[in-house]
Amino acid sequence: MAEKLEVYKCELCGNIVEVLHGGAGELVCCGKPMNLLNENTVDAAKEKHVPVIEKTNDGIIVKVGSVAHPMEEKHFIQWIELIANGKAYRQHLSPGDKPEACFPLITGPLKVREYCNLHGLWSSEG
């Protein structure tokens, strides 16, 4: 059963999907079940993957890692997502970009997720 906002990946073709409405069915791609991506479970440098949330007067800045994450062709952050108050905001990144994103100022509890093409899904709350 897929739950709202879960992220799944096809290990054959690399498709990644986020569930917008949960349901009882199984997510399938390339004829095989997709894998649920669990946050913060890959054995990798946490200081380069756990998102850091910075609140400013102008908005929210999310930086990937307390030490900047590489943004190279073979190893980079594909996207950063902010979830708050029933809304999801996402910034897609490319190699060469800074590993950060700016979002509008939002009050209340925040959850931030990012996806590293080599080390998977990471999150933090603030």
Swiss-Prot record:
Gene: dfx
Protein name, per record: Desulfoferrodoxin
The record's free-text note on cofactor binding: Binds 1 Fe(3+) ion per subunit. The iron ion 1 is coordinated via 4 cysteine residues.
UniProt entry tagged with the keyword Oxidoreductase: yes
Keywords attached to this entry: Detoxification, Electron transport, Iron, Metal-binding, Oxidoreductase, Transport
Domain notes: Is organized in two protein domains. The N-terminal domain has a fold similar to that of desulforedoxin and contains a mononuclear Fe(3+) ion, center I. The second domain contains a different mononuclear iron center, center II, with a Fe(2+) ion.
Residues annotated as binding Fe cation 2: H49, H69, H75, C116, H119
Function: Catalyzes the one-electron reduction of superoxide anion radical to hydrogen peroxide at a nonheme ferrous iron center. Plays a fundamental role in case of oxidative stress via its superoxide detoxification activity.
